[in-house]
From Swiss-Prot:
Keywords (A to Z) from UniProt: Nucleotidyltransferase, RNA-binding, RNA-directed RNA polymerase, RNA-mediated gene silencing, Transferase
The reaction(s) this protein catalyses: RNA(n) + a ribonucleoside 5'-triphosphate = RNA(n+1) + diphosphate
Protein name (database record): Probable RNA-dependent RNA polymerase 4
One GO cellular component, as annotated: nuclear RNA-directed RNA polymerase complex
Organism: Oryza sativa subsp. japonica (Rice)
Tissue: Expressed in shoot apical meristem (SAM) and panicles.
Functional summary from the UniProt entry: Probably involved in the RNA silencing pathway and required for the generation of small interfering RNAs (siRNAs).
Family membership: Belongs to the RdRP family.
EC code: 2.7.7.48
UniProt-listed GO biological process terms: siRNA processing
InterPro entries cross-referenced by the UniProt entry: RNA-dep_RNA_pol_euk-typ (IPR007855)
Length: 1183
């Protein structure tokens, strides 16, 4: 008998070197030799398919006979080839070009960069460690998994499988841009949940939904793996990592490479064997052009039913040749966009989706988007952008803009609510396969909820059944690429877990609930402080504990109470490097780095000024710090003191000595194409915001209700209301009122109305009148909902007293003119408890002045007492929270404080799972599952609790209740307050909060605009009624003015060629804007698109983002700005529509203002708009 297992002697065919090496490894491990027939069949398959077969066998749990398994798998390969009409290796040799099936190479169920010798099934290496091998366990019994497990939706029967377990392949076709995945096909792929790849391993809690495809249990166990490297496995992995859904039409099911994603450093040669010449040629273009090509190939025509199958034009090979691709390389972005639009873009996308801002400055951030939708049961991916922003996140700075993809998972448009299971069924596949764009693959990295404030706004809109955009953002990062231009790359050769370790050692987080909450710190929009952290002393000091009257530490629910939650200290020299006036990462000029050149920074022309408080994200040797730091002149230079309450992620002990580099060095190395493979941790000091001069302050319905409940009379609020209405009414006719209202909405209008007024343009100017009228109506709407301007109040960032000298109810309030003395009211939004408004004593402290110097604009709380004052106010802290501080004498005269809030509900102390309870693949699937639940099944407990609380408060303020009923209502309100505060912290605590039905109301006061309703006579109802009455609005009785041009602009001589050029551009703008108006998109998306549209024409005018940055001759700019003005105003007059004038001011507004000032006034004074908007112009109106 043939020792090889064959019946007849056959000449052994020559195998490709990599295949032969892999076969020898298998034979040595199994103690069996493959027969000549098996070898012949491997040779006939060709190298990629043979590699696929051998790797599948290597991953099988048990192998009865090696030769029989090879023949069975080879037969399966041939059957698939025949079904698709794909030639064998022999016949393929006669055909030019790569065959599609040969591009399909499956991957192993595990991956380790350095495999371990003799690892038992129960041995586990820490995830992300250099010697990591993913444990081969699917269930908790520790057994290794050789079968391929799959999810069985609705307990559907499995499709036909092989005797040894189903094996599938990944298809990498010459890529289509519209990707589809239909989970309900009869030929279900098992790889949607194979182990080893992020998001592919099922958590143990889902085991009951899984089946094992292998119907036969072989009797011989496969010996353990040896650590010798596998060239076939490496070859296959390199090819398959680039495979994915983008290259396939909607019909097939793609199979995810079942490994933790890792980038093979030498993928290019392999990829060249399996992709089209066009795809390779794309690698010669800059990535923004590549992305736009795929965005223009995405089927996204508004109002047009998408085709049942991917349109032929969606394949790059059908629309571009290699020569045409290379011809695009030297084109400007405008020429490039025009070419691809006329070639194929107009067939696939609407004109309104064309890229607008093509010539953005190099300092601007480019954000790449991908919308994932379910169309007719098929998942499609639409690439959009890049969108231009003026700030980057830490993630973008480390990886580069083009390596980060913001992915929006869209809801299904339907009259009926779509069940969460539908989204889980379809969208999990996206995370498992990744998102393929050309020869790049992007994989799930993190998601971020919109934050408390945005989340509450979203919840309120959802509660009111209004259409809104989800505040949850999902980020994918590029992990693999087959283009030479993409190497070197900092994530090359890393798993997703190791990639996350670059930013912070997130594996040390204790619970899954906090995993993404903490990791999302890297996607805050920030400014990098230019400081080498290796030269900075970052010292951990203890938090200041709360002490009782006996000097013992106070605990609540087993947790120590502290006074310094979220705040630390920073030396003066480092504070001087920071932006003096920075709010949420915004500066006057686009920049990502702050250095000592403080004279350029907005809000300060004195380099000795620096912020008192800096809200930061500090990434240091694997740890992550979140909070604020207070300037302390006592500290030695280059020193930062952080506290345990700020330390959100600790350094993993086993990685504490790894190589760390500054994020700015990463940027430099990436730009210089230097290798970053040795980097294991990125250090960075990221500024989120700083303490600033308070802007104008406003009341809210909640604040009015609490103040009135505390004794402030109705008359006070009605007087505020009357003043606000008169100011809004007179905004069109008085400079003081006009400036106030213009600055109230400066962020919405680029401060253009304020710029026009300050430039000397008369209030009667047609467009200015229309904008002031519009802003007046917005102001009235805000007033109607309780947003009323109030004097002698401030928004101040809070921190703790660094001296320990303030008493339990004393605070230090530092304003423009220094420290304040006397009583103050302090409140923290969104407090609901009557005790959330405190009456405190503002105390002058020379000791604090010695510590902070001349820094201003903050409130410092004491570090004495049994409980932190911040904790007493809406469970707040000092990690950047803003407090409302009032010195208003009438409020102080009437308000009577209540006892502080004390939590009455203790969350369930159930043990939560942490990341260490999952292997890497299980963890990725669980994390993405949590994202989908957050996105498509969010909790509305916060909004529900707040809504019902306000209804009960309205009854307390309105109806004469007997004592028993009043106590019952107050009891319900206190329960709602507790539930509300629990819901605020529920995401990070892993709790689910439900509002009991007995706390829910059945009717709402009319000022809440909800049904069923009753008419409220409370102070809130009266404000609503009076502000909503149109009679006092003088503007309602004024006839629309005629549209006239200012002589300064109308009489400017403009060369005919210039006017003709801008007339053409204006006509183009009208066509694009008409399409945008007609789109059925959410308002946020429309807003972004319109802004991009205006930015496009601003670049054409200025040759830069703004007038202040233009390199062009100013006289030329002024001529073109006047041409734009003349064209827009002529159109507005002919259409009798003043809104048509807006194009001139949104595109050329800054140039027009500058030109008007120079032309009419002669002298001009440069003044900071940021400074001016913090002032209130106080002329009073009385009839």
């Amino acid at each position: 008998m043939n020792p090889h297992g064959g019946g007849n002697q056959m000449r052994e065919p020559a195998l490709p070197a990599a295949v032969g090496a892999e076969l020898e490894r298998l034979e040595a491990r199994l103690g069996q030799l493959a027969c000549a027939e098996a070898r012949r069949q491997l040779a006939e398959l060709g190298e990629p398919a043979a590699a696929r077969v051998l790797r599948a066998i290597g991953e099988a749990r048990q192998v009865r006979t090696l030769s029989g398994f090879i023949r069975h798998m080879a037969n399966q390969e041939r059957m698939k080839r025949n079904a698709r009409g794909i030639p064998t290796a022999h016949s393929a040799a006669c055909i030019s070009g790569p065959c599609r099936e040969e591009e399909s190479i499956s991957t192993p169920l595990y991956y380790n960069e350095v495999q371990m010798d003799a690892q038992t099934p129960n041995d586990m290496v820490e995830v992300g460690s250099p010697n990591q091998q993913m444990p081969l366990r699917l269930h908790d019994n520790g057994g290794s998994v050789g079968h391929i497990a799959r999810v069985v939706p609705d307990l559907a029967n499995p499709a036909v499988g092989s005797p040894y377990g189903r094996i599938s392949s990944v298809l990498l076709q010459n890529q289509n841009c519209v990707e589809g995945y239909t989970p309900s096909r009869g030929m279900v792929s098992p790889a949607s949940n194979q182990v080893g790849s992020p998001g592919h391993r099922m958590p143990s809690g889902l085991q009951r939904h899984m089946e094992i495809d292998s119907p036969i249990q072989p009797i011989v166990s496969t010996p353990e793996r040896v650590s010798t490297p596998s060239p076939v496995r490496d070859l296959s992995r390199c090819v398959e990592n680039m495979a994915g859904p983008s290259g396939s039409p909607p019909c097939p099911i793609w199979v995810m490479p079942q490994i933790p994603p890792a980038i093979c450093p030498d993928t290019t040669n392999v990829l060249r064997e399996v992709v089209s010449p066009q795809m390779l040629a794309l690698g010669e273009l800059e990535f923004r052009k590549i992305f736009m090509i795929f965005a223009y190939l995405s089927w996204n025509k508004k109002g047009v039913k998408p085709p049942l199958s991917t349109p032929k034009s969606s394949k790059i090979e059908d629309v571009l040749s290699v020569d045409s691709i290379r011809s695009l390389k030297s084109m400007s972005m405008a020429q490039f966009e025009s070419r691809i639009w006329s070639t194929f873009g107009h067939d696939n996308i609407s004109s309104s989706d064309r890229a607008k801002n093509l010539d953005s400055g190099p300092g601007m951030s480019k954000v790449y988007h991908c919308n994932v939708e379910i169309r007719g049961g098929t998942v499609v991916k639409i690439f959009k952008g890049p969108y231009i922003e003026n700030r980057r996140t830490h993630l973008q700075k480390v990886l580069g803009d083009d390596n980060v993809l913001v992915v929006k998972f869209m809801e299904i448009s339907s009259d009926t609510e779509t069940d969460l299971s539908t989204y889980l069924e379809h969208y999990h596949k996206v995370a498992e396969e990744g998102i393929v764009l050309g020869l790049r693959c992007y994989r799930f990295f993190l998601y971020k909820d919109g934050g408390k404030e945005n989340k509450m706004k979203e919840e309120n809109r959802e509660e009111e059944n209004k259409k809104c955009t989800s505040s949850v953002r999902c980020y994918f990062v590029r992990t693999e690429s087959g283009w030479n231009m993409d190497e070197p790359y900092i994530l090359s050769g890393r798993t997703i877990g190791q990639a996350r370790d670059l930013f912070m050692h997130i594996r040390t987080v204790l619970t899954l609930a906090k995993y993404m909450l903490r990791f999302a710190l890297i996607v805050s929009k920030t400014i990098t402080l230019d400081v080498d952290l290796s030269e900075v002393l970052v010292k951990l000091i203890d938090d200041e504990p709360c002490l009782d009257e006996h000097g013992k530490e106070v605990f609540r629910d087993g947790e120590r109470l502290i006074h310094t939650d979220g705040t630390g200290l920073i030396s003066e020299d480092l504070a001087q490097k920071c932006t003096y006036s920075n709010s949420k990462g915004k500066l006057l000029e686009p920049q990502d780095i702050v250095d000592c050149a403080a004279s350029k920074l907005m809000g300060s022309n004195n380099t000795t000024e620096y912020p008192l408080l800096i809200q930061l994200r500090l990434f240091y040797n694997g740890s992550a710090v979140k909070g604020t730091v207070l300037v302390d002149k006592r500290l030695p230079p280059r020193t930062i003191h952080i506290r345990p309450s700020m330390l959100k992620i600790k350094t993993y002990p086993e990685l504490s000595g790894v190589q760390s580099v500054n994020s700015l060095d990463i940027v430099s190395a990436r730009n210089a194409k230097k290798s970053l493979s040795g980097v294991q941790s990125v250090n960075s000091f990221e500024i989120v915001s700083t303490s600033n001069r308070s802007g104008r302050t406003f009341t809210s319905n909640n604040l009015i209700a609490l103040l009135h409940y505390g004794g402030v009379p109705e008359e006070f609020f009605m007087e505020l209301l009357q003043t606000a209405i008169e100011e809004a009414d007179n905004a069109r006719f008085d400079y003081a009122g006009a400036l106030n209202i213009a600055f109230n909405y400066a962020d919405m209008e680029d401060s253009m109305p304020a710029r026009m007024i300050l430039s000397g343009i008369p209030l009667e100017e047609s467009y200015l009148q229309s904008r002031l009228d519009f802003l007046s109506l917005l102001e009235r709407k805000g007033i109607k909902n309780g947003k009323i301007p109030i004097d002698d109040c401030y928004y101040l960032m809070g921190t703790a007293d660094p001296t320990g000298k303030l008493g339990p109810n004393e605070v230090c309030v530092i304003l423009d003119y220094g420290q304040v003395s006397g009583d103050v009211l302090v409140y923290k939004y969104p407090g609901l408890h009557p005790g959330d408004i405190h009456v405190l004593k503002a105390t002058y402290s020379s000791d604090i002045e010695k510590v902070v110097g001349n820094s201003k604009h903050a409130i410092l709380f004491p570090t004495t007492g049994q409980r932190s004052l911040a904790d007493e106010m809406a469970n707040s802290d000092f990690d950047g929270d803003i407090y409302w501080v009032s010195l208003n004498p009438k409020l102080l005269e009437h308000f009577k404080p209540s006892k502080p809030w004390v939590p009455a509900i203790t969350p369930n102390g159930t043990k939560q799972k942490g990341p260490e309870d999952f292997n890497e693949s299980e963890l990725e699937r669980v994390l993405f599952h949590e994202f989908l639940k957050t996105r498509f099944a969010p909790s509305y407990a916060r909004a529900t609790a707040a809504t019902n609380w306000l209804v009960y408060m309205d009854r307390l303020l309105t109806v004469s209740l007997d004592e028993s009923e009043k106590k019952l209502i107050e009891k319900k309100m206190l329960k709602l307050v507790d539930l509300y505060y629990l819901a605020l912290d529920a995401p990070k605590m892993g709790n689910k909060v439900n509002i009991p039905r007995d706390l829910m109301v059945k009717q709402y006061p009319h000022f809440m605009d909800r049904s069923p309703s009753y008419h409220s006579s409370s102070i809130l109802g009266k404000i609503y009624d009076k502000a909503g009455d149109p009679k006092p609005l003088r503007s309602d009785n004024v006839q629309p003015t005629s549209i006239s041009s200012l002589p300064c602009f109308a009489e400017r001589d403009v060369p005919p060629a210039i006017k003709q050029l801008w007339q053409h551009r204006y006509n183009e703008y009208l066509a694009d804007s008409s399409l945008l108006y007609a789109e059925e998109a959410d308002e946020e998306e429309k807003k972004i698109k319109f802004q991009e549209l205006y930015e496009k024409y601003k670049h054409l005018l200025y040759g830069a983002s703004e007038f202040e940055e233009t390199p062009r001759d100013l006289d030329d700019v002024f001529s073109e700005a006047c041409a734009i003005y003349q064209i827009a105003y002529e159109k507005a007059r002919s259409a009798n529509n003043v809104a048509r004038c807006g194009f001139a001011w949104k595109v050329a507004g800054r140039a027009l203002c500058h030109f008007y000032t120079v032309k009419n006034e002669g002298n001009a004074v440069v003044c900071s708009l940021q400074l001016l908007r913090n002032f209130r112009f106080t002329k009073k109106y009385r009839k």
